[in-house]
Amino acid sequence: MKLAPNLLAAMLLAQSAAAFANGSADTIFYGGPIVTVNGKNEEVQALAIQNGKIVAVGKKHDVIKAWQAPATKIVDLNGQTLVPGFIEPHVHIIVTSYLEGLGVNLSNFALPYDTIDTISTKLRAQLKNVPAGGWLFGFGVDPSRTAPFMAELTADDLDKISTDVPIFIVNQSGHIGYVNHKAIELAGLTDNTPNPGDGGIYVKDAQGKLTGKLVEPPSYLAFMAKMPAPTEAQLLGAIKNTLNSMAATGITTVSEMSVGSNFGVDREVAIYRGIFAKNASPVRVRGYLWGQALPVGYNSIKPNDGDDWLRFIGVKYISDGSTQGLTAALNNPYFYPKDSTFSGDLNYKDGEIYGLMKPFFDQGWQLSIHSNGDKAIDQTLNNFAKLLDGNPKPQDRRLRIEHFTVNNESQVTKAVKMGVVPSFTIGHVHFWGAAFNDHLIGA
């Protein structure tokens, strides 16, 4: 049975069983603390569900009297606590599924940290699993958890693993990648190839030679285009595994922040529609279309297209990179390396990103802008202010800033006044907090 994930709204409406006429509930829960999150942090004794929605909360006697029928399932919690489903505001379901289903997991969460040699050993061991014509694909390398600190793979390092098999690695941030020279060759890049735009960079050394380091997802596209695409069955299986794992942790609604970033908007929208048409997802999805994948004048999908379970509600752009990857745009230089004068880069000029955002804003789309650094946050807030100028109900537009990592008090105040919602990825602070504080940006 699917339970409606928007428990909070239902509980706010359902103040007591007496608020409803008698009915026939599908399920009634009782026997443990039932947390309503109704503003007063109240707990109730019982909860009734009908047709996948909460129809009553209140005292056990009242709920059972009003809603129990012969076919009603009665669930005794036996002291366990029932809480609203968790809402995960920022995920990349297809990206995650693609990486975890088809790539080598190189994540290292504990001491001792990896070195370039240990990472290379892990990759070398996977060569035997690469089919003819295939690529060795990995993810999760984290320079902030590599010894020495911030050590990164190069094309030369990856060539030591193989010069025949193309290798492509995405690091833990998702904003930086590494390739060997075989991959560079197959992608058709040379030392004279210009950067792809939208913030993407093919990093070169002092002599103008490609190093194998890629900055921002647009720089991945030339390589992904040459990689064997997963079959529909492989991709759907991986996506369903991801959705099921989310549900197993209590997550009932997610915001998918990159629809179209891997296989194009139309294909990824079709993938989601296919999954939900078969009732194969245990969680609800709210989709944000990947702005960089949208052609000028795109209008194939209208704002809020979908239903209660799957709805496409917004468009997302990325204004800077990752803090841990030293690519977020700051107003002051990073602490690393020592005496650095580098403060990151904006992916777009002010007028450029405003011009991309405005047509979708005018169509009624919600907008979400990835901004980690305070310089990027300034740019986004200023552009939002221009968009909202003359809008009588800015709160209806649900403008979001993703991450909002390196911020200051004036930016918080400005966001509040404008009705802009910072969407914090607090897990980043937990995971990279020590690196942020001790090495990269300070307290």
Where are these regions (language model features)?
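Active-site-adjacent C-terminal substructures of enzyme catalytic domains
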Residues: 406-443
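N-terminal signal peptide c-region/cleavage motif recognized by signal peptidases
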Residues: 14-16
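Short, conserved secondary-structure transition motifs
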Residues: 290-296, 402-411
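Bacterial N-terminal signal peptides that target proteins for export
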Residues: 1-7
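Divalent metal-binding segments
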Residues: 23-30, 35, 39-298, 317, ...
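Secondary-structure transition/capping motifs at alpha-helix termini
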Residues: 274-284, 304-310, 362-363, 385-397, ...
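Non-cysteine beta-strand/loop elements that form the S-adenosyl-L-methionine
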Residues: 309-327, 420-429
